[in-house]
């Protein structure tokens, strides 16, 4: 499935129904009073969060969305029916912004949480509304009001509690696959992961925690190089970041610094998030070299560095223990 995590759409609520001019003309009431009913309210557009959705793909080609108009009033003071509301379902974690001003209109983080964006127009008045002592036979009516029009930007930010970050080929996909039931595409070349992978990791008590393998970040990601902005946004909601470093990379220290620099440049408090620094692929390097790199990383990060092998499933228990302590 294609992953779409941002969409710009135009929402147009329904117009209110018109009021009508009508007079009672019953057999025994030859000169009855005004009886024109009011028009119905136009339909509104309501956005609802749905736990079963994981992408904004539905809006890739459907960029203009309408609600139904209200119906005109009827005789005998009957009001017109309201226009049907249009319901848009989005994944939990969808933020809604005014496209023109950037103002956040809503942030739907829980299942079934809803937000009415475009309100339907009010129905017009029929002539019965204008009856008064001064005017016993009014012929006035009003048309329904136009519905609201909004241009909005939908932006999905994953609701994972733990984000796994690192340069391409650091082993993020392998790690999430062995920790959870996720089955991401894995290969020995950079940029295998083009969309965030999600996996539920179970604690001993059976409760689950959602992990996200954030696609490989590169230098310049904070300025949008590669798909930097698209991927960094998904880190914002996480509670903890696992910074995974490839021990067989040409320069693991430089790799660590690249990601830290991008977190700082992107802002939004990313650099202040809890981070666990992890050196991966321990089985592929000499023990002395591993100790040297570990010590350098600890001095640089001011944190204890964990050493693991995702493919051999070594060092994973201490890693998860650190995660559970921080959530």
UniProtKB/Swiss-Prot annotation:
Residues 160-327 form the OBG-type G domain. GO terms for cellular component: cytoplasm. It is found in: Cytoplasm. CDD domains: Obg. One of its GO terms (biological process) is ribosome biogenesis. Keywords: ATP-binding, Cytoplasm, GTP-binding, Hydrolase, Magnesium, Metal-binding, Nucleotide-binding. One of its GO terms (molecular function) is ATP binding. Its EC number is 3.6.5.-. ATP binds at residues 166-173, 191-195, 213-216, 280-283, 309-311. Residues 1-159 form the Obg domain. InterPro entries: G_OBG, GTP-bd, GTP-bd_Obg/CgtA, GTP1_OBG_dom, GTP1_OBG_dom_sf, OBG_GTPase, P-loop_NTPase. Mg(2+) binds at residues 173, 193. Its cofactor is Mg(2+). It comes from the Bacteria. Belongs to the TRAFAC class OBG-HflX-like GTPase superfamily. OBG GTPase family. NCBIfam families: Obg_CgtA, PRK12297.1, PRK12299.1. Monomer. An essential GTPase which binds GTP, GDP and possibly (p)ppGpp with moderate affinity, with high nucleotide exchange rates and a fairly low GTP hydrolysis rate. Plays a role in control of the cell cycle, stress response, ribosome biogenesis and in those bacteria that undergo differentiation, in morphogenesis control. This is GTPase Obg.
